[in-house]
Regions:
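Non-heme Fe(II)/2-oxoglutarate
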Residues: 2-145
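A structural signal for short, well-ordered beta-strand segments and their strand-loop junctions
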Residues: 86-88, 150-151, 237-238, 259
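Active-site donor-binding loop signature of nucleotide-sugar glycosyltransferases
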Residues: 89, 240, 249, 262
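Generic beta-strand or strand-like secondary-structure segments
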Residues: 136-140, 155, 186
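A short coil-to-beta-strand element that immediately follows conserved catalytic motifs
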Residues: 145-155
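Catalytic core of non-heme Fe(II) oxygenases with the double-stranded beta-helix
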Residues: 161-242, 254-258, 264-267
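Short proline/glycine-enriched turn/loop segments at secondary-structure junctions
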Residues: 246-252
């Protein structure tokens, strides 16, 4: 999302209004496969499947809370660069079932591509349905941070167990890196994982002198890192622009997340 997508003539964009318009366009069949207003899509899934699930998700919304679990708003939260945050049971029960089933079914039938340069995962950038999930989360992100935020982009990162590629085993891990500017706040939403499994992301306590550097070729010692993990239907939130973070080799069969990125609204 560029600056021009976020504001026009210094008029702040109402992202929740855009979300409601997108739902209406899904309902009446007028939605573009490229999205609408601030919500841009890069569509990879058959659009009839996206439309069906967008309409299902809309039907589970609960007033001002949308698809979110209202109980998440019953408390205040603290997060800073040395204190990552985990919130469980983020979406209401009916919304969560639709989200979980959407990713499982589309992975199982081959609609998501497998593998990228970084990890052994099913991937997609700004996938249509995931953008709805991201916009639905915005009120909770603003509640947590107590400031206006804007959704930037999403990346589907549904990790799967090691597979052989060209005769070599490919490890399922996440190399050490820092995030780019549009990831001011990195939110890993855990779609699903095997019950009882644990695969933490390690966030280095050391602040890097240069932000947004990207890939690093060393692993910070674990004793200097904060391990972060949550349950299925939870979010993990931290600032990864100048703190290296990584995952070790995955011990479970799968770990499905979608990365939902946000940044502060410029004033």
């Amino acid at each position: 999302v560029s600056a021009s997508d976020v504001s026009n003539n210094n008029t702040p964009i109402d992202f929740m209004s855009d979300l409601n318009e997108v739902y209406e366009k899904f309902k009446d069949g007028s939605i573009s496969i490229r999205g609408h207003k601030s919500m841009k899509f890069i569509n990879k899934i058959p659009f009839n499947i996206v439309t069906e699930n967008a309409n299902k998700l809309y039907s589970t919304r609960q007033g001002k809370y949308g698809a979110l679990n209202p109980k998440c708003f019953d408390q205040t939260y603290h997060i800073d660069e040395y204190n990552p945050l985990v919130i469980n049971n983020v979406y209401n029960e009916n919304s969560y079932k639709i989200i979980k089933d959407y990713f499982h079914s589309n992975i199982d039938c081959g609609n998501f591509a497998l593998g990228d340069r970084q990890a052994n995962r099913y991937k997609s950038n700004n996938e249509s349905f995931s953008r709805l999930v991201q916009y639905e989360l915005l009120p909770l992100v603003e509640h947590v941070l107590n400031k206006k935020m804007q959704p930037t982009y999403i990346y589907v990162s549904c990790y799967t167990k090691n597979q052989e590629k060209d005769g070599e085993e490919r490890k399922t891990e996440l190399p050490p890196h820092t995030d780019r500017p549009d990831c001011e706040y990195t939110i890993s939403y855990i779609i699903d994982k095997p019950e009882g499994s644990n695969w933490p992301i390690y966030v280095d306590k050391t602040k890097q002198p240069v932000k947004n550097k990207g890939r690093y070729w060393f692993y910070p010692p674990k004793e200097n890192c904060i391990p972060v993990d949550g349950d299925a239907n939870s979010l993990m939130m931290f600032n990864g622009t100048d703190h290296i973070h990584y995952r070790e080799e995955m011990p479970c069969d799968f770990y499905y997340i979608v990365l939902l990125h946000f940044r502060s609204v410029e004033t």
